[in-house]
């Protein structure tokens, strides 16, 4: 069997090379796109897991993995503190915007003092965002040639100045003051969701029930459940990967079929030529 394979490669080196390249290209593309998709979801999950709040309080339908809206009143941040078992709260606006030709990026509007204290993040350079044109970014984004004092286009044509760099990475890589993002989105006193930190993490279920009883009609999620299933929550990711694998395998198979068809046509032409010469 081995000698048959070797002899076939020696007799038809071009056809064999094309077949090998076609299969190798298909396998490489499957590995590339699958790795990119899983890498992006793993990165998002890692950044989200650095959030230490136990509960997310929001409006139904206001927050998805790639879409969000600011329709929750920030007044809830103070009202939630009155619930038994709640230690602290902080409102957040999460805004998604086009990045590059096909990508999507996000920016968060936060109250720096309450957000950084709750999630144990600190400034390693610069200062917190104060002015409407100031943002802070994490170390990963800063490493992409965005030092403190540089300008960065976050969304729209407006440039924002990098006021500081924070660590560890948590949520969106770029953050601005919640007031600045409210004015940019024309959504005064609104946010996308509110992080709720409970006094005793083991009581988070009971605290969530108290919140639901006091503020019915809103949506309450546990961060441990939201961030643990990020990959499964990405709309159509698994379907996209399956379709991608099938398409690439079909293309690789088609290359082999076309290669063989070309050889058969070439052989037929030689046979016809030989027969015509014999007559």
Q: How should each PLM-predicted stretch be described?
A:
Residues 210-265, 273, 279:
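Peri-transmembrane interface segments
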Residues 28-106, 209-213, 217-219:
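Hydrophobic, regular-secondary-structure patches
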Residues 17, 21, 49, 240-247:
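Alpha-helical transmembrane segments of multi-pass inner-membrane proteins
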Residues 55-59, 141-142, 163-168, 188-214, ...:
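A short beta-strand structural signal in non-transmembrane regions
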Residues 92-93, 101-111, 119-180, 190:
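Hydrophobic secondary-structure segments that place a key small or acidic residue at a functional site
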Residues 4-11, 42-49, 53, 216, ...:
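Short amphipathic alpha-helical coupling elements at transmembrane boundaries
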Residues 23, 41, 112-119, 129, ...:
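Structured catalytic cores of enzymes that bind and process phosphorylated ligands/cofactors
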Residues 1-28, 41, 231, 264:
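N-terminal Sec/SRP start-transfer signal
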């Amino acid at each position: 069997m081995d000698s048959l394979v070797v002899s076939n490669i020696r007799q038809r080196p071009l056809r064999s090379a094309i077949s090998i390249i076609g299969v190798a290209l298909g396998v490489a593309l499957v590995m590339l796109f699958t790795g990119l998709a899983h890498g992006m979801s793993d990165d998002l999950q890692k950044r989200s897991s650095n959030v230490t709040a136990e509960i997310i309080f929001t409006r139904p339908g206001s927050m998805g993995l790639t879409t969000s809206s600011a329709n929750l009143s920030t007044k809830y941040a103070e009202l939630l503190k009155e619930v038994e078992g709640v230690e602290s709260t902080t409102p957040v606006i999460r805004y998604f915007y086009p990045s590059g030709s096909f990508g999507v990026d996000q920016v968060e509007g936060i109250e720096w003092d309450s957000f950084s204290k709750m999630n144990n993040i600190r400034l390693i350079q610069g200062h917190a965002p104060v002015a409407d044109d100031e943002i802070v970014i994490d170390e990963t984004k800063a490493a992409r040639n965005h030092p403190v004092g540089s300008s960065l286009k976050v969304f729209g044509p407006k440039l924002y100045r990098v006021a500081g760099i924070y660590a560890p990475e948590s949520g969106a890589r770029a953050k601005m003051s919640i007031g600045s993002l409210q004015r940019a989105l024309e959504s005064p006193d609104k946010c996308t969701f509110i992080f709720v930190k409970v006094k005793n993490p083991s009581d988070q279920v009971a605290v969530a029930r108290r919140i639901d009883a006091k503020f019915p009609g809103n949506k309450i999620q546990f961060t441990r459940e939201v961030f643990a299933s990020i990959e499964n929550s990405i709309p159509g990711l698994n379907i996209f990967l399956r379709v991608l694998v099938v398409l690439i395998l079909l293309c690789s198979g088609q290359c082999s079929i076309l290669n063989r068809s070309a050889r058969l046509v070439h052989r037929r032409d030689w046979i016809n030529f030989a027969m015509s010469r014999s007559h």
